[in-house]
Amino acid sequence: MLLVLVSVFIHAACSNIEEQATKPIGESHLSADDVYVGFVIDTLKEERWYSDKEIFEEEVKQLGARVKTLAANGNDDVQIKQAELLLEEGVDVLVVVPHNAEISAKIVEMAHFAGVKVISYDRLIRNANVDLYISFDNEQVGKLQVEEILNHVSKGNFAYVGGAESDNNAHLFRQGAMSILQPYIDRGDIRIVLDEFTEGWNPSIAQENMEKVLSNLNDIDAVIAANDGTAGGVITALTKAGLQGVPVSGQDAELSAVKRIVDGTQTMTVYKSIQSLAKHAAKIAVQIAKNEEIETNQTINNGKIDVPSILLEPIPVTNNNIKETIIKDGYLTEADIYN
């Protein structure tokens, strides 16, 4: 029944959009004042996505264009419907943070049918003719996480707590992490006692997965957590087991995580400048809507095509460089962190 309903819904979406598919992709020539940008976000449950939304919207408006953001609360059907609504409203370009990398291919299909280009933001939409991808070097994120943990401990029982399996970035983080860990595993220095994705990036699920391991093995030497949310869940589990202070990685430089770094319960996070990402994406969105050429620095294969891509550099953050990184960049203030 569910499959039938989804099928009917998608058919309806395409039928509605068919009425307005009057121009081939890229043939419009608009001024900034005429541009209408649609921003479809997976969720606003995590702290960082509020920053993306606010910075992106502000930059689009500064460029003289209009923008509307819709968040799907982690629901694929809702995200497809929101994309459909924006297309029906006549957006000139669609920027998408996909909940599910595969299912979101339908959004690209609908947008192209309506003559609208699609930018995949932060997370890559797979198996679709995505027009442009902007993100960070996500394999490098995983490498940075492991490298910093190895500065503290390079032998023993390690856990890998990944992100959502439906998120292409989660796979890239893991690939980067394992590329550094593998030689240590091969020579027997490191034993992986947990290697699981975390449904929906949910900190509670990360905590549960960690607690299951700790119920059988109260000897964990380090945890590679894919982001700050999962790190928070892991640290709660470790603390309950009397293991607070075990090296734990993270990502996103969330305020709660940076405070944990100061307190010594989290070892590091990875700062990905949301200012840089959101502003860059906003400028590109307006340029694409105006049919201007975009310079990219590489391509990333999404299973179907080599997607023109712009990848920004992530930055590792520890207790030693908080002031030189996230505070200097204006992302957080000393008062935020230390009060």
Feature roles, as predicted:
Residues 1-18:
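Sec-dependent N-terminal signal peptides of Gram-positive bacterial secreted proteins and lipoproteins
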Residues 13-339:
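A residue-level marker of the well-folded mature domains of exported/periplasmic proteins
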